[in-house]
Amino acid sequence: MKRCFLPFYHASFAVLLGAFPDLAADPGGVLNLWRDPTSPHARTADGRPHLGPSQIDHRLFGEGGGPEDGAAWATIPEQLSDADPWERAYLQLRLAAERDIKVLIGVNPALIAGLPHQLAAQWPRIVEEIARGTVGGVPHTTPDPRRAEQIARRADEYGVLDPYHLWPNLRAAVAWNSALASLYLPRVRERYGPGVRLFAAPIGSSEGPVAVPVDDHPNAAPLYLPGCYFEFADAAEPIREDSPTVTAAELEPGRDYHLVLSHIGGLYRCAVNDVVHVVDHVGRTPRIAYTGRDVLRTAGGVDLTERAVVRALAGTLADTGAELRNATVETGTDRFRAAIASALPGPLPAGFATLLDKHLGETADGYRAARDAGALAPVEVLQVHQDAFQREWEHAIRSGQRRTRVKDRIFQPAPDSWARITADERAHA
């Protein structure tokens, strides 16, 4: 923690604090959705506690937690500490709703995209509890009927309560802004207010730290070389135990690599199941962007990767002017099927599916050849309800997953997820 993770974590706020130095003196204005050190701990099969990085109380190591340190209001009442993940999400939002939040730390972009959905569902309960001075039904704060009435009035005036209406002085949000998130965060950011800046979160995983932003690059950061020893394998081939690797000094801009790391925490040559793209160099240090998980789906003899889907979607959006709230892909018997939630009202533009098929032929190895040979049918596009992915996000949290772990999935891990997302299918495009 002291030599590998904590220096990485604290360094990740440098660009944010450089832009807004006053935040260091105003921890009460920072809402960190990612950290939840009082949440219940999971246990391994043999009974040992298992914690994700977001659950660790940094004070155990003599360190602060981040820009939000010292915000006494942010602590969930002890008698509610065993609340389920969805209720914990409500409790944190209820506490923050009374405050003048200026910065939102999400890290996981699904948290940034999900918060407006959560707020739309929970604001009446928030208003009621602020007026009474309760949190989760427990007396906790001074009753504030004036603030409660202000929130209710804004919801009535706008017909919806977005984060901007709740926190009009919001200035910045921090989240991963690459891969699938790069396609939907620009539209999501509008719900947080005009002029709100989006800062790239550090790139990392539960296995270890990877890259820390040092400037305003929107979605890439230089490798965090003090934290791990990194190796990279060509992502054009599946990674195996005997895959040849190169060092950070040998990385080539414009190429994709499997990420392998070792560090003093005990991991040795761990393939973390992530693929990164080398953007350029900062000095001699490679700057990388996360492109997706190393997961495949196969149809018609074609292995489809997450990064191929994201790049094909990006090209299709650019060609059609469409905007999306999220997307996912599944394998049919002889084709791939894409579920698209549009960010704009009405049906997807005419020809969307044809253009997506064209771009998949450009980004996915073997796709065009399989189409030409008749082994693969054209991609099928299903336009789903605008809120389909936010509903699935809520379902996952209500089912017991910690919200920091509920992430975007180009390929859903279970068939029932696809079934729920496409339950209110509105159109074929």
In which residue ranges do the predicted regions lie?
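Conserved nucleotide-state-sensing and coupling region of NTP-binding domains
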Residues: 25-42
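Short, solvent-exposed loop/edge-beta patches enriched in aromatic
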Residues: 18-25, 97-100
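Hydrophobic alpha-helical transmembrane segments of membrane proteins
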Residues: 12-15
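Active-site glycine/GP-rich loop and adjacent strand/helix microenvironment
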Residues: 43-429
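Conserved AMP-binding A3 loop
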Residues: 1-10, 20-24
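Amphipathic alpha-helical scaffolding segments
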Residues: 4-7, 30, 121
